[in-house]
Amino acid sequence: MKQSEVKELSVAELQEELGKSRKAYSDLKMAHAVSPLENPIQLRTVRRDVARLATELTKREQQ
């Protein structure tokens, strides 16, 4: 998810997407631990998506 897409989401949508992304990251890490992923770069992209969402959520809560 790109930063421009993240900025357009509401706070409730951000929280929902953050939960989904964290779950996806957890699932990918578990799958990678059991057997190597075909594309391990997925871990990095999902982790960065989680960071983008969390950063935007924190920024909005402070305003």
From Swiss-Prot:
Cysteine-cysteine disulfides: none
Keywords, sorted A to Z: Ribonucleoprotein, Ribosomal protein
InterPro entries for the chain: Ribosomal_uL29 (IPR001854), Ribosomal_uL29_CS (IPR018254), Ribosomal_uL29_sf (IPR036049)
SUPFAM superfamilies (UniProt xref): Ribosomal protein L29 (L29p) (SSF46561)
Domain of life where this protein originates: Bacteria
GO cellular component terms attached to this protein's record: ribonucleoprotein complex; ribosome
Membrane-spanning ranges: none
Record GO biological process: translation
Keyword Ribosomal protein set for record: yes
Family: Belongs to the universal ribosomal protein uL29 family.
The gene coding this protein: rpmC
GO molecular function, one term: structural constituent of ribosome
Coiled coil: none
Protein name per the record: Large ribosomal subunit protein uL29
Alphabetized Pfam families for the sequence: Ribosomal_L29
